[in-house]
């Protein structure tokens, strides 16, 4: 049985950054990413996709406290995690992150890794109203899946709940084509709600059919490199939204700490969703 090391308490970003990096910690809070709301009648929201590589950083050290500190930097409303582990002990990564963020947890594990469940997860400030697991496994390939969670963002002033679909697609081109077709068919037949699809789509080919299909359905979103974290070249992590007008901006989070905490950078998107009418409003 593999034992997890004792974990340190959550540290601030300056304490947790790579000791070899002497650069200042960037001021990259969600508020600075998104700026002021553009118009009345809109509710702002920040959403992140983050492949945390089992909390093993670019220095090959298991340090979930660094992932927790990156999440503190981001201060997002919803975080989709990939390559996250969970187990019966609070020393496992997902339990550790949930304890430090205080967010609701939705797990979507696809296989067992060592003595832990392994796969996808959502951290959300909003209570989940409904959760469905989508099996995206292709025969002969690693098990894959997606979380479909409807969250009660009406608590933050939104006019309706929000559907969040979080995934991690396969490594083979044919596998990804099959998985994207499954996801798009699923979204097209689901109950209509504002929908965010996000995750590590593992798509290296910008001209490939999976990205073209996704852009055709959701409309194109910015191409932002997130991998590898030290010198990002590839936009493996993606965020789409329907309707597209809700999306304000997409950016990778490139703080010194994020560059060492995982082999992927977090991808952060800012949204403005229709706000609920105030009581007594005409």
Q: What are the residue ranges of the model-derived segments?
A:
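Active-site regions of metal-assisted phosphoester/phosphodiester hydrolases
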Residues: 1-78, 89, 99-100, 104-282
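Short, surface-exposed acidic-centric catalytic microdomains
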Residues: 92
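A short beta-strand-loop structural module common to alpha/beta enzyme folds
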Residues: 80-85
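Serine-esterase "nucleophile elbow" of acetyl-processing enzymes
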Residues: 95
């Amino acid at each position: 049985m593999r034992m997890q090391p004792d974990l340190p308490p959550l540290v601030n970003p300056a304490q947790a950054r790579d000791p070899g990096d002497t650069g200042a910690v960037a001021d990259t809070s969600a508020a600075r990413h998104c700026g002021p709301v553009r118009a009345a009648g809109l509710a702002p929201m920040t959403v992140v996709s983050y492949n945390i590589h089992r909390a093993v950083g670019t220095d090959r050290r298991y340090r979930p406290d660094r992932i927790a500190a990156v999440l503190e930097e981001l201060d997002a409303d919803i975080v989709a995690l990939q390559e996250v582990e969970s187990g019966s002990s609070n020393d496992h990564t997902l339990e550790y992150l949930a304890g430090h963020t205080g967010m609701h947890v939705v797990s979507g594990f696809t296989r067992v890794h060592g003595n832990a469940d392994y796969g996808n997860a959502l951290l959300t400030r909003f209570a989940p109203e409904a959760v469905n697991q989508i099996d995206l496994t292709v025969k002969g390939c690693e098990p894959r899946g997606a979380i479909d969670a409807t969250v009660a963002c009406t608590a933050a002033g939104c006019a309706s709940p929000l559907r969040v679909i979080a995934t991690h697609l396969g490594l083979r081109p044919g596998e990804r084509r099959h998985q994207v077709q499954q996801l798009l068919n699923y979204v097209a037949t689901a109950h209509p709600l504002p929908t965010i699809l996000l995750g590590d789509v593992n798509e290296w080919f910008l001209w490939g059919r999976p990205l073209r299909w996704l852009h055709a359905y959701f409309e194109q979103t910015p191409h932002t490199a997130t991998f590898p974290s030290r010198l990002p070249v590839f936009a493996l992590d993606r965020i789409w939204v329907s309707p597209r007008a809700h999306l304000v901006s997409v950016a990778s989070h490139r703080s010194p700490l994020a560059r060492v905490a995982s082999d992927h950078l977090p991808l952060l998107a800012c949204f403005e969703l229709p706000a609920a009418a105030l009581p007594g409003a005409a």
